[in-house]
Curated annotation (Swiss-Prot):
CDD domains: CIPK_C, STKc_SnRK3. The gene is CIPK33. Coiled coil: none annotated. It is an enzyme of class 2 (transferase). Residues 305-329 form the NAF domain. The keyword Manganese applies. Its EC number is 2.7.11.1. This is CBL-interacting protein kinase 33. It holds the Pfam family Pkinase. It catalyses: L-seryl-[protein] + ATP = O-phospho-L-seryl-[protein] + ADP + H(+); L-threonyl-[protein] + ATP = O-phospho-L-threonyl-[protein] + ADP + H(+). CIPK serine-threonine protein kinases interact with CBL proteins. Binding of a CBL protein to the regulatory NAF domain of CIPK protein lead to the activation of the kinase in a calcium-dependent manner. SMART domains: S_TKc. The active site is at D136. Its cofactor is Mn(2+).
Length: 454
């Protein structure tokens, strides 16, 4: 049995759950109600954009990215604006992060790492040729599509964390130093293209080695290692790969290898295939200007989020590949999120999550919501409990942030979703494993659920 579902809508898009969060933006899964196609929508706080005086740069870079249709770059479909938000409609990429593969399986074979690196360089080179620089290449920005092809996200959208000063060069303070070029850390101004290339080199090293070239618990020592390019190759690295990486991870941007030179490198060229794509398609940039127009006639229609009722069958069908026992399956590949069901009351589930989180140095913030008309046949999507877990001590990629939601399936049955909101994937992996041990006695196995539903 099911009831009417009312979801939050923005224009023609029906918004779903949050799939990512950052300082300036939140990313939600959405569906085009006209075509049924899935998309991702990045939601920016307009006030923050205006406060940082980045309007013109954001408009310019989004305009450029709208014109780019490259097989290895996440595409921007359209941009919408309301009085308070900017909505960037993006291609939805289903394969997860490239670095999830490293977490699950360790380092890659050289030919596999080379293929991904070739696709990364293709994407970076193409965008650089159009004056767009990433400036924040890191694992979260490297996604895989359903065919296993690399997709680079957030090209042209990193300007929110940058500042251009009077010298005309980019300046930034970076909370993710492991992938960042020495000249960026020095904050003396830097060339966006050369900084991107350094990050590509760090990424290639991780693919080949299975670990970071620059790592230290002491931030100043880490900065010194990066500035002097102090790293050691693992013994299995081939000489041609070493030679290329040494030229990319050159701390002097003036002598660092360039992308045209990489394209001629013998190691890089092995098995290289140029990307095939067609740029000849109609597009419009009218929506980019309209986003920052204060006139309400240019604002997209927003509908407030309201409680939604789903039956248990719908809940499972909307959760692609849902395995309610996967939290405790040792063979299950690690992902950025997981779900399970429990017959325990929400407060007991919350207590167990706190038991797992606090010893690991997490601050736990609770939000309670009143349950809306619960009944035996429906799930109330008005979340009864929502937790935000934040690591007090910043890791190598800032503070790990974990979002947890507990939803009622029936008065005696709840579904719990745990996902990484922001921070380092490896850190979340450690938290995930500890959580699985702590919660074993509160999880209701998937076989039990299937018997209940049959």
């Amino acid at each position: 049995m099911s009831t009417t579902k009312v979801k939050r809508r923005v224009g023609k898009y029906e918004l779903g759950r949050t799939i990512g969060e950052g300082t300036f933006a939140k990313v939600k899964f959405a569906r085009d109600t006209e075509t049924g196609d899935p998309v991702a929508i990045k939601i920016l706080d307009k006030e923050k954009v205006l406060k940082h005086k980045m309007v013109e740069q954001i408009k310019r870079e989004i305009s450029t990215m709208k014109l780019i249709k490259h097989p290895n770059v996440v595409r921007i479909y359209e941009v919408m604006g309301s009085k308070t938000n900017i909505y960037i409609v993006l291609e939805y990429v289903t394969g997860g992060e490239l670095f999830d593969t490293i977490v699950n399986h360790g380092r890659m074979r050289e030919d596999e790492a080379r293929r991904y690196f070739q696709q990364l360089i293709n994407a970076v080179d193409y965008c650089h040729s159009r004056g767009v620089y990433h400036r924040d290449l890191k694992p979260e920005n490297l996604l895989l599509d359903s065919y296993g092809n690399l997709k680079v996200s957030d090209f042209g959208l990193s300007a929110l964390s940058q500042q251009i000063k009077d010298d005309g060069l980019l300046h930034t303070t970076c909370g993710t130093p492991n992938y960042v070029a020495p000249e960026v850390l020095e904050d003396q101004g830097y060339d966006g293209a050369m900084a991107d290339l350094w990050s590509c080199g760090v990424i290639l090293f991780v693919l080949l080695a299975g670990y970071l070239p620059f790592e230290d618990s002491n931030l100043m020592t880490l900065y010194k290692k990066i500035s002097n390019a102090e790293f050691t190759f693992p013994p299995w690295t081939s000489f041609p790969a070493k030679r290329l990486l040494t030229r990319i991870l050159d701390p002097n941007p003036m002598t660092r290898i360039t992308i045209p030179e990489i394209l001629e490198d013998e190691w890089f060229k092995k098995g290289y295939k140029r990307p095939e794509f067609d740029e000849k398609y109609d597009t419009t940039l009218d929506d980019v200007d309209a986003v920052f127009n204060d006139s309400e006639e240019h604002h997209v229609t927003e509908k407030k989020e309201e409680p939604e009722a789903l039956n248990a069958f719908e809940l499972i069908s909307m959760s692609a590949g849902l395995n309610l026992g996967n939290l405790f399956d040792s063979e299950q590949e690690f992902k950025r999120e997981t779900r399970f069901t429990s017959k325990c009351p929400p407060k007991e589930i919350v207590r167990k999550i706190e038991e797992a989180a606090k010893p690991l140095g997490f601050d736990v913030q609770k939000k309670n919501y009143k349950i809306c008309s619960p009944c035996l046949t429906t799930i109330c999507m008005n979340i009864p409990f929502k937790l935000r877990l934040e690591k007090v001590k910043a890791g190598r990629k800032g503070n790990l942030n974990v979002a947890t939601e507990i939803l009622q399936v029936a008065p005696s049955l709840h579904m719990v979703e745990v996902r990484k909101a922001k921070g380092d994937t490896l850190e979340f992996h450690k938290f995930y494993k500890n959580l699985s041990r702590t919660l074993k006695d509160v999880v209701w196995k998937s076989d039990d659920l299937q018997n209940q539903l049959s």
